[in-house]
C-alpha cells in the first residue's frame, strides 16, 4: 500500500514525462531526513536537489507519522534530475516495536508483557493508521465495526 500526496502526484506527472534515470528504495525515519550519511551522499550522486527532498519529506511525514518511525520510501528520479517520492505503509511489526520500545528494552528473558487494555488501544491506533493511510476511511464508527 503506497501513499502519495497531492503535491507529489503533481510532480509525478512532470517526472514521468522524461525517461526515468533511477528508482531508489530507501528506509528513512519520519521527519528526520537530513544530509547525514548514508542518505545525503546517496542522493548527491544522482545530482538532485537534496534540500528540496528533505524539506518535502519532513513536512509530509511529520503530519502522518510519529517522528523517527522507520518508513519505506520509493524515490523516482528522471534524467532531468526532477524527482518525486511515494511512501509505503510501515510494516505492522515495526509499528508494534515503536509502540512498545520501552517495554522491549526493559524486558528480561525476551518476554514482553503488555496490559490488555493498552494492547487493544494500540491495535485500534494501528487499524486507524491502516485505514486512513490512503485517506479511504476516516469515520470512527466504520473503523470500530470493521476492526474491533
Curated annotation (Swiss-Prot):
Cellular localisation: Mitochondrion
SMART domains reported for this sequence: RL11
Keywords, ordered alphabetically: Mitochondrion, Ribonucleoprotein, Ribosomal protein
Gene3D superfamilies assigned: Ribosomal protein L11/L12, N-terminal domain
Record's GO cellular component terms: mitochondrial large ribosomal subunit
GO MF entry, a single one: large ribosomal subunit rRNA binding
Primary subcellular site in the record, as a coarse category: mitochondrion
Name recorded for this polypeptide: Large ribosomal subunit protein uL11m
Organism: Dictyostelium citrinum (Slime mold)
Amino acid at each position: 500500500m503506497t501513499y502519495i500526496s497531492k503535491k507529489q502526484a503533481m510532480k509525478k506527472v512532470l517526472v514521468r514525462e522524461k525517461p526515468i534515470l533511477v528508482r531508489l528504495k530507501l528506509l528513512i525515519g519520519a521527519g528526520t531526513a537530513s544530509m547525514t550519511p548514508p542518505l545525503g551522499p546517496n542522493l548527491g550522486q544522482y545530482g538532485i536537489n537534496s534540500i528540496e527532498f528533505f524539506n518535502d519529506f519532513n513536512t509530509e511525514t511529520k503530519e502522518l507519522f510519529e517522528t523517527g518511525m522507520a518508513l519505506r520510501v520509493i524515490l523516482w528520479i528522471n534524467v532531468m534530475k526532477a524527482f518525486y517520492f511515494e511512501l509505503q505503509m510501515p510494516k505492522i511489526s515495526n509499528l508494534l516495536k515503536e509502540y512498545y520500545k520501552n517495554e522491549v528494552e526493559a524486558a528480561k528473558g525476551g518476554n514482553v508483557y503488555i496490559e490488555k487494555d493498552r494492547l487493544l488501544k494500540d491495535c485500534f491506533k494501528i487499524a486507524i493508521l491502516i485505514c486512513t493511510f490512503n485517506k479511504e476511511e476516516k469515520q470512527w464508527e466504520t473503523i470500530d465495526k470493521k476492526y474491533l
